[in-house]
C-alpha cells in the first residue's frame, strides 16, 4: 500500500473516496512521472538517495527520516496526506520456540519498550500506555500525532486484491 493511493491523491481523489482503488486512473497518473521515479528496494537505499540529494524528495518510512535527521542530514518530514498501513508481530503455528517468541513479543510491546523505541526510531508506539512515559515534545513529532490529513490504507482491501494489484503493478513497471 502507498504508491497507488499517493497517485490517486495527487490526481485529486479525496482520501475518503480512494477505495476501491481506481487502478486505471492511478497508473495514468503514475505514467506522467514514471521517467523521473527512482525506485528504492530497501530503507537504507531510501536514506542514501535523500542524503546524497540524488532524490530531492521521496516517500520514505518515517523512521528512516528520523535516522537521517539524527545523523545531521538536513531533512524535513511532510505529514500532509501521510499514508499509514498496519503491521503485525506473529508466531507461526508449530513454532519450535513459541514460548520464547511470545516472551519477546510481550517485552517488545511493553509500554517501556515501545516508549524507548519511539525515542530511538521515530515510530509511534503501539502500546497505549507508552505515551505517558514519553517526552511530550517527542510525542508531538510521531506519526500518530499527525492525523489531520492522515490517510489510512485499507488493509482488508489490500488483502483481498493484492494479487491482482501486484500483477498490474509489475506489468506497469516492466513496460
PLM regions and their residue ranges:
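Sec-exported extracytoplasmic/periplasmic mature domains
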Residues: 8-13, 34-35, 51, 55, ...
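Solvent-exposed loop/turn segments at secondary-structure junctions
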Residues: 1-3, 62-66, 82-84, 96, ...
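Extracellular/periplasmic bilobal clamshell ligand-binding domains
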Residues: 134-175
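A ligand-binding cleft/hinge motif common to bilobed small-molecule-binding domains
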Residues: 57-74
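Extracytoplasmic ligand-binding site segments that recognize negatively charged/polar headgroups
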Residues: 1-54
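Mature extracytoplasmic/periplasmic domains
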Residues: 92-150
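Short, hydrophobic alpha-helical packing/hinge segments within bilobed ligand-binding/sensory domains
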Residues: 46-49, 65, 101, 114
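Periplasmic-binding protein-like
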Residues: 27-32, 69-95, 130-131
Amino acid at each position: 500500500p502507498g504508491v497507488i493511493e499517493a497517485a490517486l491523491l495527487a490526481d485529486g481523489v479525496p482520501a475518503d473516496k480512494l477505495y476501491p482503488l481506481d487502478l486505471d486512473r492511478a497508473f495514468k497518473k503514475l505514467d506522467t512521472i514514471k521517467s523521473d521515479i527512482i525506485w528504492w528496494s530497501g530503507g537504507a537505499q531510501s536514506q542514501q538517495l535523500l542524503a546524497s540529494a540524488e532524490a530531492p524528495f521521496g516517500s520514505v518510512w518515517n523512521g528512516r527520516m528520523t535516522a537521517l535527521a539524527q545523523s545531521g542530514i538536513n531533512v524535513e518530514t511532510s505529514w500532509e496526506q501521510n499514508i499509514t498501513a498496519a503491521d503485525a508481530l506473529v508466531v507461526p503455528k508449530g513454532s519450535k520456540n513459541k514460548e520464547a517468541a511470545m516472551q519477546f513479543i510481550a517485552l517488545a510491546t511493553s509500554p517501556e519498550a515501545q516508549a524507548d523505541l519511539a525515542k530511538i526510531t521515530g515510530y509511534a508506539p503501539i502500546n497505549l500506555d507508552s505515551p505517558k512515559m514519553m517526552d511530550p515534545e517527542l510525542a508531538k513529532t510521531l506519526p500518530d500525532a499527525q492525523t489531520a490529513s492522515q490517510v489510512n490504507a485499507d488493509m482488508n482491501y489490500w488483502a483481498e486484491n493484492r494479487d491482482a494489484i501486484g500483477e498490474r503493478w509489475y506489468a506497469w513497471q516492466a513496460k
